[in-house]
Amino acid sequence: MKTRKKISARLLAIMLAVTLLLPLTWNVPVEAAETKQIDVLFSHDTHSHLNSFSTIVDGEQKEVGGFARIKTLIDEKKQEDPDTLVLDGGDFSMGTLIQTVYETEAAELRMLGYLGYDVTTLGNHEYDYRSKGLANMLEAAKDSGETVPALVVCNVDWDSMEQDGLSDGQKQIRSAFEDYGVKDYVVVQKGDVKAAVVGVFGKDALECAPTCELKFKDPVEAVKQTVEEIRKNEKVDMIACVSHGGTWEDENKSEDEILAKEVPDIDLIISGHTHSELKEAIQHGNTYIVSCGEYGRNLGSLSMTQKQDGRWELTSYELIPVSEEIKPDQATQKRIDALMDTVDKNYLSDFGYTREEVLAENDVEFNSLEEMGTKHEELNLGDIMSDAYIYAVENSEYYDGDPVDVAVVPSGTVRDTYTKGDITVEDVFNSFSLGIGKDGVAGYPLISAYLTGKELKLAAEVDASVSDFMTTARLYCSGLNFAYNPHRMILNKVTDCYLTRADGEWIEIQNDKLYHVVTDLYTGQMLGSVT
């Protein structure tokens, strides 16, 4: 009995000591070898900007961007950490002359592979060349034999399309997806970190893709289901998402913030589509959302460390300016130059141009692209675009002599500004580069239509009511002016609407009269749902 008491006392003392030491043990830092860490580089919305380009930075004209400089940054990072994960959030195409060889050369996707990107996804502009164009591009990328990034998108609704019967375009894309190896997600091993990367196509992205024939599941539900599948079938350390959903100022409408809240198992979201430039990561729970802006002006860089509960903490985050100070990788630039020679030969030669040919000397300080759509005001960049529409139509061989009353240009279709100095063929193309025509030639064609005065007024009402929330839909018009009261009810804000002539004359709009309106095909497709 005495012995048992001694043993009990000793046992109690040992247990007490262990209990007291446990908190100290929990607070001791884990050895570096046991702590998992990952470095990530990322981009999105590069829009065929393989070459550097001239723009205004802090009031000064500078050359920024370019895949040759991005290659330098990626190589430098991989010298520090060979296991760096490199991701892209989609819309890698459509925005420069490079897009003219999209179908035949798959230049953008192949260059992403050459730079060392691991995974990307599809944005709405990958569908600009329609189903056949996207399918041809994917086949060209695969047939090149070069290393290309994995392509992931989890919410294509093939079941729904099959029930309705696949169209020829849908069949083409499905075949190309299968040949390329497009998946819902991929698992990437980076050192001791096993990461799953899922891709998703957002709701607003689909609304901005009038030529897309595919049907899509709800993004949140599709990602949720995919993450459950990953958790069930893959032993991964982290889950990242390359999303073409985007972020908005209104958190309740911000697609990737909604995704982060609804699917909390995601550790990291690379957020494309809205061209957001997040100086600081957005955090919801244990999920981080990051964006670095468009056109390769910046390269996103971050590091994450795994915590003891298995989740990841963002330990560093920066947007690296792809500036003149960064030395371009010469081998990369040589590849880009060869692609540009192909553009000259296969596209521009048909029009009697070369990419570096000077079309005009500019002494005007045009608005920056960032200013477009931010608020209701006259901008000289929007004005010259809409005036150019009228000039082009009235000097076309197809012009029937009926004067154009109104030209309409949404801010989202303007892709670049003009800097002072020489304006080249490439500059002009880049400023208005989207889409293709019925003939398959790059660039959305202009279209003429006749709208009633009532329909013109409705377009003005939509602009006054909606464009504050959807700045890419802000209209810049030549020939149409309106006044509005921002405090009135939606679709009842316009107080006056009239036509203006070049000589300054104001003309009252009559509801039942037809007016000659010019816009581009993309805008015409979008305006069709309004008028």
Locate the predicted segments by residue.
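Solvent-exposed loop/linker segments at secondary-structure transitions
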Residues: 47-49, 94-98, 112, 231, ...
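Acidic, metal/ion-coordinating pockets
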Residues: 32-325, 467
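Bacterial N-terminal signal peptides
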Residues: 13-23
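Bacterial N-terminal signal peptides that target proteins for export
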Residues: 2-15
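Sec-dependent signal peptide cleavage junction
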Residues: 21-34
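Generic structural marker for isolated residues within well-ordered, non-membrane alpha-helices
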Residues: 17, 256, 386
